[in-house]
């Protein structure tokens, strides 16, 4: 999906900011971003969603699966309180402590643009109902999500708990 490519460019910018200031921060960002990306990629692969217009056709999908995709997209976009917000929050704290507010403002604004597209995609998944479904050869209900995909989804959704645990340790 092209959206994943554009999102990767945005995340690359955040990783470069983290890399310039703190090596551990960069590795933390990369690890969490990889976890979230793998979660989304596995879901898209399980349901054979390779193009943007195919995502609109998942109206026939189980509402729980649609909700998981929605939450994972918001997490990947960096919306609080999901796990995807944690690395950005750490970079924000680091840049604020180093008084690099100009670059921080630009990064946050660009992230809001990316988050807008994730919200638009999520809205399309829930609200639009496309009945024409010529690209699928199998019934979407017959496809099962792998246990690994489910585990990754719940980890990315449970970001608030991980953030709280992170601050309790510090």
Swiss-Prot record:
Substrates-to-products reaction catalysed: a ubiquinone + NADH + 5 H(+)(in) = a ubiquinol + NAD(+) + 4 H(+)(out)
Transmembrane spans: 24-44, 67-87, 101-121, 150-170
Principal location listed in the UniProt entry: mitochondrion
UniProt superkingdom: Eukaryota
Coiled coil: none
Xref: Pfam families: NADH_dehy_S2_C (PF06444), Proton_antipo_M (PF00361)
Enzyme type, top EC level: translocase
Family the UniProt entry places it in: Belongs to the complex I subunit 2 family.
Stated name of the protein: NADH-ubiquinone oxidoreductase chain 2
Name of the gene: ND2
């Amino acid at each position: 999906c092209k959206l994943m490519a554009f999102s990767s460019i945005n995340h690359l910018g955040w990783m470069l900011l983290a890399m310039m200031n703190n090596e551990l921060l960069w590795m933390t960002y990369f690890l969490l971003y990889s976890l979230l990306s793998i979660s989304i990629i596995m879901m898209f692969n399980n349901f054979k969603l390779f193009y943007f217009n195919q995502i609109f056709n998942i109206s026939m999908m189980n509402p729980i699966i649609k909700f998981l995709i929605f939450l994972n997209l918001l997490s990947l976009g960096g919306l609080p309180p999901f796990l995807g917000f944690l690395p950005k929050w750490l970079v924000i704290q680091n840049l604020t402590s180093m008084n690099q507010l100009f670059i921080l403002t630009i990064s946050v604004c660009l992230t809001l643009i990316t988050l807008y597209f994730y919200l638009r995609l999520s809205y399309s998944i829930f609200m639009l109902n496309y009945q024409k479904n010529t690209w699928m050869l199998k019934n979407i209900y017959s496809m099962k999500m792998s246990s690994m995909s489910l585990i990754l989804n719940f980890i990315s959704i449970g970001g608030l708990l991980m953030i709280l645990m992170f601050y309790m340790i510090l």
